[in-house]
Amino acid sequence: MKIYLVAAIAWILFQSSSWTTDAATAYTLNLANPSASQYSSFLDQIRNNVRDTSLIYGGTDVAVIGAPSTTDKFLRLNFQGPRGTVSLGLRRENLYVVAYLAMDNANVNRAYYFKNQITSAELTALFPEVVVANQKQLEYGEDYQAIEKNAKITTGDQSRKELGLGINLLITMIDGVNKKVRVVKDEARFLLIAIQMTAEAARFRYIQNLVTKNFPNKFDSENKVIQFQVSWSKISTAIFGDCKNGVFNKDYDFGFGKVRQAKDLQMGLLKYLGRPKSSSIEANSTDDTADVL
């Protein structure tokens, strides 16, 4: 009888482990007493988590995202402030934001996610403190245009550029969604700033450097920032296929002037485009068109 009981327990444990998705790796940015060096280290943690150190594109030293994984799919980023923690969920294969977590005005954890970007089971693994009943699909899409529309920006060109960037602004936007009744406009504005201060800053050291230069103050964004954000795929493709030893085979213009050397782009992370034919040689020698998130 004992043998059958042990076998039954073992079978249940085995089934449970096969049904459960491993929790995502999480990194935390302390916003209670932030510093420029802490922010830079936070971005480096993101890059190091998703990069494949064996991939070298165009003979550069720019980190490259690894091939998509069927098991380790998501990354969790926590913004820890004096009023609590708000979290983002990112897809590791491209750093696209799929969900966020915040407390409501009754101090109940709630997770909000973009349609078709993450399953309920994956969301539970990403944000285990949120019960399934408190998972809610966002009413708008994950692309910048959809989020901007819901942010109801009325100044200038009505794009995210008009909101600015900066750590203090990020803190303000977090306070707008944490322990509050959900307001879609505040939520969308939080997402626009949080995405740019994490995923985009990890992709582009140019953006990171603007944040640290002005740290911790809010500063006006610029057209060049937006051009970088909509050109990640184009830049990655150019470095992957038309760059040798860090030099492009021709001048490239990604919307902010011609460049010939990849280092002038101040890239932080390149999109995964496969393994280049010359990757082994480069390794030895060195011993988007779509506006999406």
Swiss-Prot record:
EC numbers, comma separated: 3.2.2.22
GO terms (BP aspect): defense response; negative regulation of translation; regulation of defense response to virus
Catalytic activity: Endohydrolysis of the N-glycosidic bond at one specific adenosine on the 28S rRNA
Keyword line: Allergen, Antiviral protein, Glycoprotein, Hydrolase, Plant defense, Protein synthesis inhibitor, Signal, Toxin
UniProt tissue specificity: Expressed in leaves (at protein level).
SUPFAM superfamilies: Ribosome inactivating proteins (RIP)
Disulfide bonds: none
Keyword Cell inner membrane: no
Enzyme type, top EC level: hydrolase
InterPro entries documented for this protein: Ribosome-inact_prot_sf, Ribosome_inactivat_1/2, Ribosome_inactivat_prot, Ribosome_inactivat_prot_CS, Ribosome_inactivat_prot_sub1, Ribosome_inactivat_prot_sub2
Job of this protein: Single-chain ribosome-inactivating protein.
Family named by the database record: Belongs to the ribosome-inactivating protein family. Type 1 RIP subfamily.
Protein name according to UniProt: Ribosome-inactivating protein dianthin-30
Species this protein is from: Dianthus caryophyllus
Source organism phylogeny: Eukaryota, Viridiplantae, Streptophyta, Embryophyta, Tracheophyta
